[in-house]
Amino acid sequence: MARDKIALIGSGQIGGTLAHLVGLKELGDVVMFDIAEGIPQGKSLDIAQSSPVDGFDAKFTGANSYEAIEGARVVIVTAGVPRKPGMSRDDLLSINLKVMEQVGAGIKKYAPDAFVICITNPLDAMVWALQKASGLPHRKVVGMAGVLDSARFRYFLADEFNVSVEDVTAFVLGGHGDTMVPLVKYSTVAGIPLPDLVKMGWTSQARLDEIVDRTRNGGAEIVNLLKTGSAFYAPAASAIAMAESYLKDKKRVVPVAAYLNGEYGVKDMYVGVPVVIGDKGVERIVEIELAGKDREAFDKSVAAVQGLVEACKKIAPELLGH
C-alpha cells in the first residue's frame, strides 16, 4: 500500500513544523511547496536527515511548482504574510486574499480530491476564499482555529488547577480573533463543568474571566513576545490533529472553521463550530444550543467574520463567480 501524500503549501515556521510532525507521526510522504526557491528543498532535506535518528520512513520533497502536489490526500495551507506587531488580522486581508486565489487554483488543478486545512490569517475569511477559489466541496475545506484556541484555553485551565491537560476539555466557538467565544459551561475538568468547579471553590468567576481573556488574546500575546513572527508549534500540532482524524477516519469531535449553510442561523460562511472529522471530511456539524450571553457573543463573532467576508467580496469579486 502506497503511503499517503501530504502537501504543505508554505514553508515558513508552521510549514517546517508540520513537515516534521508528519514524519514523526508517520502519516505519509511530504511535499513542501513555496514560491521561494531553495527554502522548501532545504527544509525537506534537513527533516529527511533527521529520519534515521528518529526512525521514521517518509519521503520529503521540496518544490516551487504546484505540479508536485498532484494526488495529495491532505493539503495544509500556511502560505501568506504573517501578522506583525501592531498589525490587525484585517490588514492582512488584501495581501493574503491574492495568495489564496493562487493556492486555490493550484489545488483545483492538481489535488481536487484532497482534504484541505487552511491556517492562513485572517482565518475565517481566508478559508472562505480558498474554498471559492478551489471549487472543492465545502466538507473538504476547513480552517484550523478552534483546535488551537481550545488548546490554549485547556492549557491555561490545567495550569490554573494544577491538573493534567489530558483531563481538561474546553470549547471555543466563533471566529478566530478577538471575538472568539470560549464556552465556560461546556468546558470541564474530568467531566466536571467549570461553573461547578467555581462552586466547589477551585477558582473564582473573576479568575475564569481572566483566563477567557487570555485565551482570546493568545495569538497576540505570542506575537508581542516574539517580536518577529507568530506562534507555530501549537498551530502546527492542531492542524496535524485534524489531518490525522481525516486520514485515519477517527471521527474526532473538534472545533474547526466549517462551512455553515443554515446551522446556527448562519448562511454561506465559515465559522468556528464543533464538527466530526472522518474520511469524508466534515461529516457532521454539532449544533449546540446557545442562549443569553453566549448567543450574543457568538452573533458578535459571526458579524466580525461577515465583515471580513464582505471585504473579500469587494476586493476580489471574481471569487463569487467560482
Swiss-Prot record:
Keywords: NAD, Oxidoreductase, Tricarboxylic acid cycle
SUPFAM superfamilies registered for this protein in UniProt: LDH C-terminal domain-like (SSF56327), NAD(P)-binding Rossmann-fold domains (SSF51735)
CDD domains: LDH-like_MDH (cd01339)
One Pfam family this sequence matches: Ldh_1_N
UniProt keyword ATP-binding present: no
Domain of life the protein comes from: Bacteria
Gene Ontology molecular function terms on file: L-lactate dehydrogenase activity; L-malate dehydrogenase (NAD+) activity
Active-site residues, as the UniProt record annotates them: 176 (proton acceptor)
Described function: Catalyzes the reversible oxidation of malate to oxaloacetate.
UniProt-listed Enzyme Commission number(s): 1.1.1.37
First-level EC class: oxidoreductase
Name of protein: Malate dehydrogenase 1
Keyword hit for Cytoplasm: no
Protein family (similarity comment): Belongs to the LDH/MDH superfamily. MDH type 3 family.
Biological process according to GO: lactate metabolic process; tricarboxylic acid cycle
Amino acids binding NAD(+): 10-15, 34, 96, 119-121
Catalysed reactions listed for this entry: (S)-malate + NAD(+) = oxaloacetate + NADH + H(+)
Binding site for substrate: 83, 89, 121, 152
